[in-house]
């Protein structure tokens, strides 16, 4: 199971990003992280922007409520989603 931690404002999800995919989608688990495929290339923050937008749409929150808190320049990221509980996150991501 991938790592999800709840804090006072929301949840932090450990994510492994695969840029330049054919479509934006969840792709299971990889090395304890949620694998996410994104169509955006890893250039000038495009994949990071797409990652925030994808999680915002997935959880039904504004893109501004989703923030990458670690891993800005790598594939492994920690994504913070405000206004979501761990239970809600596990239900949506299962």
UniProtKB/Swiss-Prot annotation:
Pfam families (UniProt xref):
DUF167
Superkingdom classification of source: Bacteria
- Matching SMART domains, A to Z? DUF167
Query: Which GO CC terms are listed, alphabetically?
Result: cytoplasm
Q: Which PANTHER family does UniProt cross-reference here?
A: UPF0235 PROTEIN C15ORF40
Q: Family assignment?
A: Belongs to the UPF0235 family.
Protein name, entry field? UPF0235 protein Dred_0717
């Amino acid at each position: 199971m991938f790592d999800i931690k709840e804090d006072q404002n929301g949840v932090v999800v450990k994510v492994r990003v695969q840029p330049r995919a054919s479509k934006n989608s969840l792709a299971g688990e990889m090395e304890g992280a949620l694998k996410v495929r994104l169509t955006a290339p890893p250039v000038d923050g495009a994949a990071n922007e797409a990652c925030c937008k994808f999680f915002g749409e997935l959880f039904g929150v504004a893109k501004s409520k989703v923030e990458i808190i670690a891993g800005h320049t790598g594939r492994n990221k920690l994504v913070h989603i405000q206004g979501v509980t761990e239970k809600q996150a596990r239900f949506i991501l299962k």
